[in-house]
């Protein structure tokens, strides 16, 4: 697990939302394309046809936690039996990992803090990865985004998924060197501050992720294309 996802501002909760009627099956020529399959699973998520388990991902260790509950999938606000309030505010569809199927990105108000939940499909199930605000900064239409763990620990990444769990692939970063000075990297190469600043300008100029105000009807319409 990347250190910018660990503890404090960068802790991540991964919810594995396993569809009760879904299972792995062999590919068939008559099967719908991956994006259509994903759309159907996302609709099942919002209609409540899911069994939900909650896992805390921290420092690379996965452990069940009873302190977190999934949102009521029939509404956008309120979680029974929990003192954590979850309100979905907006959403976007975006193929983050380039596999031909869109992820469903939800922006949420989570107990007064803005966070994100990224739904992806794997092996006939929906997986939801919850990321704090500073772990998914300035998301762009090309699937890239920035993260920050402090003044000398920040950068930009692309996402990939391992068994439904989001993993950061950093392609740019600033960190603190052994001498206390900033160290800059881009695409695996060391660069100077000026080049890193130029990269940040280029990243900022990219088209932003297009958000839509959340409602179940709006999600259904977007999934229908």
Language-model features, listed with the residues they occupy:
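Beta-propeller blade termini
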Residues: 87-96, 135-145
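Bacterial N-terminal signal peptides that target proteins for export
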Residues: 1-9
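Acidic/hydrophobic-patterned starts of short beta strands in beta-sheet-rich repeat architectures
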Residues: 98-108, 142-147
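Acidic, small-residue rich beta-repeat scaffolds with periodic aromatic anchors
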Residues: 24-62, 146-225
